[in-house]
Structures are given as structure tokens and as C-alpha cells.
């Protein structure tokens, strides 16, 4: 413990002329400094009392009522920072009342000063601050005069309201409102008044010794490292790492943030926070000078500091995190002073836990920390997530999530079908945002488009949603450059409401049961957005001038009994919104054929607009990734070409051996960049069976069917039809005692492309004219065996069957039955 006095490594006495009579007092003060501890959190902007009082705040054990700006000295000591022992010029300091024209405090010249400090009276390990300073500090131990090296007074050198680069690397001003609270939590040993050895750097002057005690700010130095770094420290204010973190062996720089100028006047505080925030978050709550209205005392101890260091990883002690900026009161009332009190540990002598306004269960990890009137100056913000007091519905309705607008939905499902009864016109001039409306979308034959929902029998009305979608070869989605526009007026008969879903305007139209769920769309126009506004969006790749076709997309949501929602969607034909494109680009509205065999050669008539004599029709097959696999130009008949119609010969497909239909596209081209939208076309396989339709006089009967039951005579009856294959199901044939087969076998069914005349010889249509075995003039005897000598059937032959005499028919049946079975 005596190494402090014996170590002369950083003794600067040989550099400066000190009074040798004060060396003893300086040594005694250094001894007392090791047992002194200055508290934090005390603002230096307290009101200044005029009378020289004593130290009224009590201290327990090693606790002292001192501010971050610590000044050692007595009120009656004649020497101070205002006077220099070297006889330097005193004109560098402005008068106490001097201020600059803009209201800021007067600038004062910086200087280098070395000051020795004395400790307080130590008696049995306790400090008594409630005695007069004159009694505590005897004459031999009073603070010596300060050795001052004054520099020239440069007005533009440094503003006292700003920190110098040599003082701190912190980006906050010492007088800013945002940093006033953290400035008051500066380390005591960071002040030039409490450091045993000073850093030889230029730093602004702090409070005079004789000004510290009248303000009730006692001076103590922290029990810590005996030496300070001679270099600057990255920060002097308390942050999360320094206030709650472990104490390092090398304290911060002796330079500190101060709230008083060299002339003794209180510095002006900016009402706004510092424009450059600190790179480290700090537990500040932006307490201004007005909120510190009296002496504030903090009780600390070494045990509490050790406990805080051990729990420094807990974030629940962040004082400023729970107070948002907008939660602060705008009008500060003069309420009791703020006090952040820390209970001393149980082993502290004479420790009395102060009263607390908060129950200890609010801070379980830190029950020894008490809050005084800390939240009196701010709106009440609870520490835990705010429980909304808004009453909730006793039976909350969980609305199912509706599909997004870019989802591909069917137009019919089950008994429901959403259908466009009247298609819109192929061209509509969209209006810009800067011009008036151009009216609602019209239909081709006059009037307006209409939409109807079929299969809905409920009495509840539904909502029909309408938005503008794309009309290119990609998947249907909301159009980026066009929006729906609500049309109102005396001529509009349909009510509507405009909504926005995912940055897309949606027009909501009611579907009423009294109107058969039908709506006339006379309230929808098309609005053109500016290309520059859309093309600059993030992720937008479309170009507005090349994407001028749209579709009217209708969507309806039908609630189901099981709580689900059925969504149907249907899109209209493409609508050209550009006037120039409508006059130049070809448009296909209708095609006479939708499919053809792969051999091609079939003619197709296209109906639309802007067809020319040299218009070309190109068939294209695309890969799943969009690349063209096959392209073929079809032949057009120039003699039959008209501006609104075009005759084209379908080309053969590239693969003649396909086994399933293949869907391709085609478009009409009037030039290099004048193409129509892609139209769909389907190629069918070429090996589809084709059956001749010419009748024949001698029909070969089909193979007989085997018996179906052991109790019956194996007598069977043939089914007239083409000899295709043996039916797999024996019950499909006419058997004695059984009605005729209701349908044909799957093997014997003709292809879909066959002529409807070929069903005359089939089993199913032929059986329609039979009511039973008696239809052929055969009666069933008692034994269940057919007889061939029965009378002919009274009715005439089947209209579609060949003209066969009943007698010849029965004879052929008997002859066939007498032949041996294979």
C-alpha cells in the first residue's frame, strides 16, 4: 500500500515549479485517494447555491457525494484556476458575465495545468462529509495553487461546448441534450481534478476548486489504478460497456465532459440532440439540465460494482432502451429530482436501503437497484410488451387467406362457373393520369361487357373483383403499366368500389341474386401509368411502350359450407390500349379451326383487324423454358385476304408420329416488330383409326360371347358390329334371360374423330331398338332356351339397321348356333 508514495516514475515535480511546502499535503492526499470513491450519475448542471455550504449528502462507508466534475478545495481557499502562480496574463478569461453576441458562452483559452489533490479525512474506514470543509481539511493539507501554462486566446481555436480531438473520440457534444445524461455518468477518475497523475495533453479547464464545494460537489478519486494513460481515451462518457462491463486495469483518459465554462457560468445546452450519434449505444435518456432540479445522490459500493460487473451481460439494465424518443414529455414540470439509487450490499456498514417506488419483482436480476423519481419526467412505458386493452370479439372470425392476384385460378369448379357473356372491344384508348377519363370499356357489338356466375343458388350476394391483367404469352398477372379506373356518372348503372390489393387497384362490383348473379361492367375504365415510374421499380423488367395489351380479369370468391372459400377467375380477350398500336399491329379475334391432324393441309380463316396482303402466319412450338423448338410459316391466300379476315393453310407438324395431341401457337406478322398476340392451336396424331361408312350386303357377324352362368344353356346371341375384337366383358352381349347390353365395350368403341354414321352397326346403338329377346321375333320358352320358330317382331326394323328380313335373320342365328364351338 506504500508503493504509491514510493514510486516516482511519473512524478512531474521536476518539470513544474511546485511549492515544496505542499509536497507533504500532496503525498497525504495521494494516500487518501486510494480509499475514496466518487459516485456517478450526478449532473454538473445543478443550480448554483450562493452560500458556501458544507457537504449535506451522507456517505456510507466508501461512498461520496461527488459529481463527474470533481473539484478539491475549500470555499475559503484563495488560490484557484482563475489565477496562475506563474504570473501569467489573466486577460485570457472573459468576465463572468461575458457572452458572445449569439448567446453562446464566452470562449476561453485552453491551457496545461498540473494539480495535486488531497483526500478527505479518513477515520476508521469511513468518510464524514457532513462536517465543514474547513474542519475536515486542516491547513497543512489544503490544496496548493495550480500551476498553469496559459496559451494565447484564439477565438476560433475551440468552442468550450465542443470536445477537442485530444480530449475524446466520442462524437457527442458535452452540452448536447442527448449526451447530458451520459456526461453526468462520467468516471470520477477521468477528471483532471481527481487524477493523481495528469495526462500531458491540452484540455479545457474544469470547474474551479472554490466552485465545487458551494455546489455540494465533493471531490473523491476512485480506488483503482494509480496511473492513468498519458494518451487520449476513445471515450469519457459511460456507455453500455463501461457502465455495466468489467473495469479495466487502465482507466480512461483524465479528460472529461464538463457542464461549466472557465468563467464559472453555466454553459448553454442545445435543445436538439447531437447530429452525429455515438458509435456505441449508451444508457442515456437525454436528461436536460432542467430536469435535474436538486442535489442527487447515488449510493454505491465495491460489492455492488462487482455484482454489476458479473451481471453485465444482462440487457435488462439498459435504462434508455425502454424510453422511446417520442414518449418523452414535451412540457417538463418541476417535480422532485431524479435519483438513481443503488442499495449497498449487506456487508456495508451503516447502509440503509432507500425507499423505492417500484416493487423488486420488476427487476428480478437486479433487486438491489432501486429507481427513484426516474420516470417522472417521461411518459409511462412498461418494460414488458404492451398488452393492448382493446376488447376482442368473443367469437373471433378467422378469415381465410384469399389467393393472390397473380395466382392462376380456374373459371369453373363443380356446379359454379364464372363466364364472360359479352366480351369487351378489342381496342380501348386508355387515359393518362394528367388527362380526363375516356369512358368505360365498351363491347364489340355495342353496350358494355357483362359477367355472370352460373350455378350459384344461395340468397347471399357476392363481390365480383375486377383488375387489369397482362395479355402476353406469359402467365396471367396484374399489369404493371395499367390500372383499372372507376367510372361514375349519371349513365353508369352499376355500383362499384375501388380498393387496392398489393399495389393493384381492384374494382369491387356486387353480384346480386335478384339479377341472376349478372353484372354489366359499365363502370370500369383503364388508366395508363407513367412508364418511368414503373420501369424504375426494383425487379421490373418490362418496357411500357412494348406492353400495351391488357385483359379484364374477373374474380369471385364463393364461401363453402365447410368454411372454405372457392375462388374462380376468368379473363377477357386482349384489349389494345395504345392508339398507335391499335392502328398498326394485327389483331386476331377469332379462328375457324382449333385443331388439325399432323399432316396439315386444312384451311383456317382468321378474323380480326389490320390484316395486309403480305401478312404472314407463323406456327411456333415452344419449350418449357420459352425457347422456340419449331417454326413454320403457313401459306396464305392473298386473293381472299381482307383487312379483317385472312385465309391460311395449316402446315404439317414437324413430328408425324406423335401419340398424343401437341399444343402449339401461331401469330400474324405485318413486319419486323408488328406482331399479333400468340394464338393457340392443337395438332392431333395421324394414326387415328378411320372406319369406312359404305354399307355392305353381307355383314360378318361378330364372334359369339361365352356363357355367363352355368345354369343357362350355352346358347348365345351375337352382337352385330364390325369385327374389331372380342369383348372382354361377356355381359356386354345379349344373353337369354338378360336385357341387352347398355353400352359397348371399350375395345369396340370408335375413335372420337369417326363419323357419326359409323355407330349404326355398333352394339349399343343397335340395342336401343331392342326391348328384349322378343325384339328379334324370338320368344323365350319355359326352359329358358330361345326358339327359332317364333313369329317375327311386330315392329319394323331399326331405323339405323340394314334392311334384313326377320326370317332370314332367324335362320342365320340358328345356323350359327349349330356350328361347333371352337
Swiss-Prot record:
Localization, UniProt: Cytoplasm; Nucleus
GO aspect biological process, one term: positive regulation of transcription by RNA polymerase II
Keywords of this entry: Activator, Cytoplasm, DNA-binding, Nucleus, Phosphoprotein, Repeat, Transcription, Transcription regulation
Motif Nuclear export signal: where in chain: 302-313
GO molecular function: DNA-binding transcription factor activity, RNA polymerase II-specific; RNA polymerase II cis-regulatory region sequence-specific DNA binding
Processing and modification events after translation: Phosphorylated by NFATC-kinase and GSK3B; phosphorylation induces NFATC1 nuclear exit and dephosphorylation by calcineurin promotes nuclear import. Phosphorylation by PKA and DYRK2 negatively modulates nuclear accumulation, and promotes subsequent phosphorylation by GSK3B or casein kinase 1.
Sequence repeats: 195-211, 225-241, 274-290
Described purpose of this protein according to its UniProt entry: Plays a role in the inducible expression of cytokine genes in T-cells, especially in the induction of the IL-2 or IL-4 gene transcription. Also controls gene expression in embryonic cardiac cells. Could regulate not only the activation and proliferation but also the differentiation and programmed death of T-lymphocytes as well as lymphoid and non-lymphoid cells. Required for osteoclastogenesis and regulates many genes important for osteoclast differentiation and function.
Protein name per Swiss-Prot or TrEMBL: Nuclear factor of activated T-cells, cytoplasmic 1
Organism, as annotated: Sus scrofa (Pig)
Gene name, Swiss-Prot/TrEMBL: NFATC1
